[in-house]
Amino acid sequence: MSRPKEMTRAVIVGHKSILEETIDALHDINLFHIEDFVEDESGFKISKPFKNGEEVSKKLVKIRSIANYLGIESKKPVVQKSDAVLRELDTKLNELDRTISAKTETISQLENELKDLDAQKREILPYLSINLDFEYYRGYESLKVFAGTVKGSLEESQISSITKAYELYYDPQSKAVVLFVAKNDADKVYELLQGLGFKELRVPERGGVPSELLRFIEQKEAEVTRRIESLKGEIESLKVKYADFILASDEVLSIESQKAELPLRIATSANAFIIDGWTATEDFDKIVSVVNSATNGKAYVTSLELHHEEEEHAPVKYNNSKVVAPMQEIMDLYSRPKYTELDPSSAIFITFPLIYGMILGDIGYAIILGSLALAIKKLVKSDAVKPLMNILIYCQIWTIIFGVLYGEFLGFSLASSHTAHGMAAGLIPGWETITLFESIGGEEFTFPIHRSHMVMTMIAISVLVGLIHLNLGFLFGFSNIARHHGIKHAVLEKGSWIIIELGVLVAVLGYFGGIQVFTYAGALILVIGVVMLTMGEGIKGPIELPSLMGNALSYARIIAVGLSSIYIAGTVNDIAFEMIWPDHSQIGAAAIAAIIVFILGHGLNTILSIIAPGLHALRLQYVEFFGKFYEGGGRKFNPFGYIRKYTEE
């Protein structure tokens, strides 16, 4: 167990003439967490950004807009000198902006042209079956032209009964109709067409035969599409060419922006500045040295004496080894520890994977999930993903350990065992189940441990693990309280719970062992523990006594969730092998289907093997374990600086 790194509150004071050098020095070392200044009656006020702040912000917005448009993502860094990036920035940024703007504008025009061509095509398509030049549809003084579609069937006899002077073009399939009649007969013909559900269509204004026009439009569409694709290809080549420059420029401008805007967070007067913040105590001397070097000793750096109230609000920097560090993700998911309390990362480094492994306990699933985690860790470069994959790997190590204890591989038993129907063979020849002793309810305790045959024993073991876990929490709570309120409070508030458990244990052993002295002694210890608890926590303490049993019984989920995984795997195996050997003598025709069932079934159970054990192991940490000692609510230590990836000084 460890506590967060010891922090020192420091103040940097100096003349405004050295503010920029001070900011540069603090940013470069990336070790100083700056507290935002809140204006008060002291006479100090927040200042304005540096003169280059607005220009830097505009360039940063532009470079990020370009990066977003091009779809540029983080990649394996090509480290460049920041000075070189800044020298080329204006030229390359303007060139890139002009080029992309020109190409995107052209693409936009071409896409509008495509939409126009599509609209022209939609106008022509209804007339495609009528091979008549559109010039013939207009320009008549004595003729009326009806162009559209009808719902019913149109016969020439219907027209000829009205007038003999007509010209009809009609397609029975598309119901398209073009009808030329004398204007004197137009009203009667219109009444006829209306009765057939006539719907007038717009006649294209251009001349030409529909089929030829359609061919021309499609050729034009293909040409425009090719030009668009060509321009998009050119833009994609810009992405390849300028990706490193854009990533490096974004980094350099982000750094310059941070520096330029820092005056908005610190106290300044007409001539002086004050920067207030925190640093790890081990880094304080380095900050003094770097700031003095950057300002030629003109800045004053000092540490402040901390009061208890200030410690409560100190930012928290974890103090864990590289191996334990991934568990900080689990801590941050819940809440970062306060500066004044224990950091349980080291504890859950053991307890979380252990409980996960105890639940899953299958070598086959552990190998699959472990391999998957290693592959993702290698392929995905994200700093957010790697710790999660490390946690998954830790869990699979414990899963393999328990898989050996349980003798399980994808739901199969590795060791042969005696059953009511005779000897059940295991996957490993010669490995037989050994009976060690008789356990709870007449169950035989064996090696390997067959969980489905030792349910009561496994429940008892799970609850025992829970009690150990809970008492570890009480010990951590004891340490936290002893540090802040003294041993007496720690003994009354947390030690009393352990004494109560001891009393119950002694009384139970005395009762079942027939030793009355133990029974009475246990009862006395229990009463003493309850009195101490009442003194420490008031009436709330005894009221919470039943919760201890509830917390302990919550750990029975270890065996419950584990058994569900076993039964799913066993069911998949039974179905698959029943399909392969339907009569237990020869392989059946459904072997391929059985293999699919086997793969899909175990694939689904593999996914569940991440979710179910993970969630339940996490719940036991957050609810049962943390509930005994942990408050959380700490602030993240966020130093002023930037972790460079694509540039260097």
From Swiss-Prot:
Keywords: Cell membrane, Hydrogen ion transport, Ion transport, Membrane, Transmembrane, Transmembrane helix, Transport. GO terms for cellular component: plasma membrane; proton-transporting V-type ATPase, V0 domain; vacuolar proton-transporting V-type ATPase complex. GO terms for biological process: vacuolar acidification. GO terms for molecular function: ATPase binding; proton-transporting ATPase activity, rotational mechanism. It holds the Pfam family V_ATPase_I. The chain crosses the membrane at residues 348-368, 391-411, 422-442, 458-478, 498-518, 519-539, 558-578, 592-612. It is a multi-pass membrane protein. It is found in: Cell membrane. Component of the A-type ATP synthase that produces ATP from ADP in the presence of a proton gradient across the membrane. This organism has both a Na(+)-translocating F1F0 ATP synthase and this H(+)-translocating A1A0 ATP synthase. Belongs to the V-ATPase 116 kDa subunit family. PANTHER family: V-TYPE PROTON ATPASE SUBUNIT A, VACUOLAR PROTON ATPASES. Has multiple subunits, A(3), B(3), C, D, E, F, G, I and K(x); there may be a few other subunits as well. NCBIfam families: PRK05771.2-4. This is A-type ATP synthase subunit I. It comes from Methanosarcina mazei (strain ATCC BAA-159 / DSM 3647 / Goe1 / Go1 / JCM 11833 / OCM 88) (Methanosarcina frisia).
